[in-house]
Amino acid sequence: MDSIDRLKTYLATYDNLDSALQDANESEERREDKYLQDLFIEDQGDKPTPSYYQEEESSDSDTDYNAEHLTMLSPDERIDKWEEDLPELEKIDDDIPVTFSDWTQPVMKENGGEKSLSLFPPVGLTKVQTDQWRKTIEAVCESSKYWNLSECQIMNSEDRLILKGRIMTPDCSSSIKSQNSIQSSESLSSSHSPGPAPKSRNQLGLWDSKSTEVQLISKRAGVKDMMVKLTDFFGSEEEYYSVCPEGAPDLMGAIIMGLKHKKLFNQARMKYRI
């Protein structure tokens, strides 16, 4: 009989087996209770740190600082001492002067009735900085669609230049005056003269499409495309022709007229490809 069989035979004939198992269970329960109690003890006194923790802490380069010395200093002195011990490379110098030793001013040239303006970025810019400089120039040129740059006022701020000017609005007064003069001439003519000329086929066709939606494509991240129609800007056919009697070349042109009529064109140009 091997050792396993002998052990089974012994346990089967052991009189105190039940008592031994009960003692083992009670011992296990006491151990678990003590473990749970230790988890909620807040003040356990000054217990020595296990050696494996000490070894791990001593290997960390961040703990090389003399902590005992810091406890003897006031809070302000601790901060000053800590800053003195920082590596020089970690200190940030905000007073570094930035100058461009080599810079070419803009040059305006005229050739055969055409003008050209050459703009030169400061020498030494990184690729990212050069792109930022270029986008700034493009933004200034883009703004000329909304106002007359030559009339803008340039204001110096602490960290920027501010351009201020009057927003350009669509001028339909010439068309209205032209129509009024035609109507006045017709009223002075003989009674047999025909009435006002009917609207062109194109104009009638555009208003017939007053409920047709046109998609404005977004050109900014985070801005969704927008669907608009003529009735979003004009309450009636009369209002449409009172804004610009000559009409528009196409439906998108009429939408643009509506945006200008509601003074929304400048905002739309910043967000959508118009």
Curated annotation (Swiss-Prot):
InterPro entries: P-protein-C_vesiculovirus, Phosphoprotein_C_viral, Phosphoprotein_central
CDD domains reported in the protein's UniProt record: VSV_P-protein-C_like
UniProt KW keywords: Chaperone, Host cytoplasm, Phosphoprotein, Viral RNA replication, Virion
Region (Interaction with N(0)): 1-59
GO cellular component labels: host cell cytoplasm; virion component
Span list, region Oligomerization: 104-165
Chain segments carrying region Hinge: 166-202
Sites of Phosphoserine modification: S59, S61, S236, S242
Biased composition, class Low complexity, residue ranges: 174-193
Skewed-composition ranges (Acidic residues): 54-65
Region (Interaction with the L polymerase): 49-101
Region: Interaction with the Nucleoprotein-RNA and template-binding, residue numbers: 254-274
Basic and acidic residues bias locations: 27-36
Site entry: Interaction with the Nucleoprotein-RNA: K260
Signal peptide per UniProt: none
Post-translational modification: Phosphorylated in the N-terminus by host CK2. Phosphorylation of the phosphoprotein is required for the transcriptional function of the P-L complex.
GO molecular function: RNA-directed RNA polymerase activity
Broad class of the protein's primary localization: virion
Region (Disordered): 22-65, 174-204
Entry comment, domain topic: The N-terminus is disordered and is involved in binding N(0). The region of interaction with the L polymerase is necessary for transcription. The hinge region is highly variable. The central domain is involved in oligomerization. The C-terminus is basic and essential for binding the N-RNA template.
Quaternary structure and partners: Homodimer. Interacts with the L polymerase; the association of P and L forms the polymerase complex and positions P optimally for encapsidation of newly synthesized genomes with the nucleoprotein. Interacts (via N-terminus) with N(0). Interacts (via C-terminus) with N in ribonucleocapsid (via C-terminus); this interaction allows to package the L polymerase in the virion and positions the polymerase on the template, since P acts as a bridge between N and L.
Protein name: Phosphoprotein
Upper lineage: Viruses, Riboviria, Orthornavirae, Negarnaviricota, Haploviricotina
